[in-house]
């Protein structure tokens, strides 16, 4: 921390901007005497080295600046271009198989830490493009001294919310196993069609990993049980997390489950409807506890629709998430029980909570 540094080296000059100074005070660090405040385009010459400062707000804090050393052509990039994971004795990205050992951590770092701020990242990349950068030193992860174009291309894709892989991510949240079984069968059917697929049980896997692959894949299937007339909580947490990170331009599909009142599909569609350019395939699979005899054909149809959409073949039937299919019949506003019929008898009472017909809505 700056405070610890100044205790050990009281003559140190802290170089920062005005917002950084305000944050130092908020964290109860005494404002250092003789601090040097800099802004966009300012330079600092230390002899052979001249550092130029560039603002990078919200990548990923509002005060962030990066600095460029013109002598050695080094970009000190703060959190940009960083990764999760320990170095384990490795200093440079070209000393490892980055795709195998680091790419997943780099993507997970970007999506979870910076992913919401794609426009700000693109603005920083535009500034960097005008510099003769030959080495990138981030705060987290290995240093880059080769293949900088590879790194920049990844960031451009992530920051513009473009998928890296045309394939399907399946995220399932199951209570008694019925939803998980259906999700597993769908994954098998997609694999049989040659479609790249990744399956996660969001009750077991932390949502940060699923969010990362949501940025990676072009298509996402959300499969969730109904819980207390809502979305099973691990799935709701994932959906909220994806929405909060501003993911967009994806095609999705839904599998909902509910032993007596399946409602998760409609609610998942509502959350997806708040996101930009999220489309849903028409094929929504509804389970009641588990796959019923003959329902495997619904999964086959969903696999066909997903495969066609992934391949960009004849346009798969899609609809705006706001128009996602609604359950047929009438739903109890108290407990969520669905009465499947075109009409509701006036003397009807909910078999679950006992409420009268007046407490039902279409």
Question: Can you say where each PLM-predicted feature lies in the sequence?
Answer:
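Residues immediately within or flanking Cys/His clusters that coordinate Zn2+
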Residues: 329, 347
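Active-site HxH/HxHxD metal-binding segment of metal-dependent hydrolases
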Residues: 1-44
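Catalytic core of the metallo-beta-lactamase
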Residues: 28-96
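Metal-dependent phosphodiesterase/nuclease catalytic metal-binding core
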Residues: 66-109, 114-137, 142-172
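FMN-binding flavodoxin-like domain, especially the glycine-rich phosphate-binding loop
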Residues: 87, 98-136, 141-143, 185-200, ...
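Short cysteine-rich clusters marking metal-coordination/redox-active sites
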Residues: 332-335, 350-353
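Short, charged N-terminal beta->alpha structural module
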Residues: 171-193
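Short, non-ligating residues that shape and space the ligands of small metal-coordination modules
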Residues: 341-342, 358-362
